[in-house]
Amino acid sequence: MPWAVGRRWAWITLFLTIVAVLIQAVWLWLGTQSFVFQREEIAQLARQYAGLDHELAFSRLIVELRRLHPGHVLPDEELQWVFVNAGGWMGAMCLLHASLSEYVLLFGTALGSHGHSGRYWAEISDTIISGTFHQWREGTTKSEVYYPGETVVHGPGEATAVEWGPNTWMVEYGRGVIPSTLAFALSDTIFSTQDFLTLFYTLRAYARGLRLELTTYLFGQDP
């Protein structure tokens, strides 16, 4: 009936309006945030260690980040490599810093993997330490290959196909609505692998990052 169709369109219009307002509110909120890290800062630090053994590179990077940003990088006893299954690919990550609007982590795969990048309310950049990163951008018919020392930027709302060769490791920085990225990052873990221990490890790492940021905000950091 005509009135039913009209009512349906009214609900659709209301839903789209709410989504638009929510998106605008989110970006206004991000515009008011003061960020701890900068994308180019992380990329430049990572480039210094590109080509080294990835474990050596990561250990040196962590030391430097703690020197530059005391109180914002998790202590050694809380660093943990955790599997990530998302978008059909499998890798591992070690979270160094996390807040509601930023994160810094180490990421990679020992075996190689490929799949969907995901779409995020965040900008994500990866600077490669070792291996290769293949990216096929939406709307194109050719892929691009990135090598150690190069940075791959994934903009908000973008989607790509990604492939990492064996022993590919990188430093990743994300800025945006970070909790929104967890839905994609945990989807395969919940609905496919059902590896709930990994789910616990991931949520615990993020909670530790939030706790550290709250502690530093409330009590400061000893020089």
From Swiss-Prot:
It is found in: Nucleus inner membrane; Nucleus outer membrane; Nucleus envelope; Cytoplasmic vesicle. Residues 2-8 are annotated as: Targeting to endoplasmic reticulum-associated lipid droplets. It is a single-pass membrane protein. Signal peptide: none annotated. Depletion by RNAi alters oligodendrocyte differentiation and enhances opioid analgesia. Sigma receptors are classified into two subtypes (Sigma-1 and Sigma-2) based on their different pharmacological profile. Homotrimer. Interacts with KCNA2; cocaine consumption leads to increased interaction. Forms a ternary complex with ANK2 and ITPR3. The complex is disrupted by agonists. Interacts with KCNA4. Interacts with RNF112 in an oxidative stress-regulated manner. This is Sigma non-opioid intracellular receptor 1. It comes from Rattus norvegicus. The lineage of its organism: Eukaryota, Metazoa, Chordata, Craniata, Vertebrata.
